[in-house]
A protein has these predicted regions:
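Non-catalytic alpha-helical scaffolds and adjoining flexible linkers that form interface surfaces
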Residues: 4-254
Length: 254
């Protein structure tokens, strides 16, 4: 599936980087508009010339969530880079992509695309994405996705304190705690807002474990902690000021 590195132009030096393909869109008659999360420059948008007309040049390298080595050229006074060549390092298509797995992969892509700024490298997020994608091989995706959501909130600086009530400062420990779509943190029973949702002590302990251990060493709980995921996604949506499309799709898989 890998496409060789055949440079089409030597007019400007090529940038080379590891990258994760986030999205592709039809562009003009035969091109694709591609959003990449590169290791060296962060999120880069570029054009893959004739990618729709012939698969020989890029092969399967532009499938979403494919881990690639990419060569691209930045052009003066133009926002879009020109993709020169791609080499597949790891593809999600090497194992069966069921509908639940496709939704899970799409969720990772959407979070990366919505949360990351253009042209700003973030190696911690890049390593996080690779580790989570390695765990999304089958249909058991809830815990890896919650891990990814939680760490994205933390790395973006959006994750509030989970140990104390945001209103009174009371330590929550194992007591009951609540969250609300418009509140930036957790609340104790005495200071919760109307229409708040509860997050269990077990889910808060899981969050603490997730923030201390790599995903590969995480003790997988029997329950998937949907309350923790809901809390984190509400936090992220509040900061990006929009609803995540894949969140609704994931909820329908229950």
């Amino acid at each position: 599936m890998a496409a060789g590195f055949a440079n089409l132009s030597t007019s400007m030096p090529l940038n080379e980087s590891e990258a994760i393909v986030l999205r592709t869109y039809p562009f003009r008659e035969s091109d694709l508009l591609v959003t990449l999360f590169t290791r060296t420059e962060g999120k880069v948008r570029g054009v893959a010339r004739a990618a729709k007309k012939s698969r020989r040049r890029f092969g399967g390298a532009l499938e979403p969530l494919t881990y690639i080595k990419v060569a691209y050229e930045d052009r003066e006074r133009q926002e879009l880079a020109r993709l020169d060549s791609c080499e597949v390092l790891e593809s999600p298509l090497t194992t069966e992509v069921s509908y639940p797995r496709a939704v899970a992969l799409g969720h990772v892509a959407e979070l990366l695309d919505e949360l990351l700024p253009d042209r700003e490298a973030n190696d911690a997020v890049f390593r996080l994405a690779l580790s989570v994608l390695a765990c999304l091989r089958g249909d058991e995706f809830r815990i890896p996705l919650t891990y990814f959501e939680l760490w994205m909130a933390r790395l973006m600086g959006y994750l509030p304190d989970l140990s104390a009530c945001l209103n009174c400062g009371r330590t929550l420990n194992g007591s009951r705690a609540y969250f609300h779509a418009l509140a930036d943190g957790l609340m104790c029973p005495e200071h919760k807002r109307l229409a708040s949702s509860e997050i269990s002590a077990e889910s808060r302990r899981l969050a603490d474990q997730m923030l201390r251990l790599p995903l590969s060493r995480l003790e997988v709980p029997q329950k998937s902690a949907p309350d923790l995921s809901k809390f984190v996604l509400q936090t992220l949506e509040r900061h990006i000021e929009k609803k995540l499309v894949t969140r609704t799709m994931l909820e329908r898989l229950k």
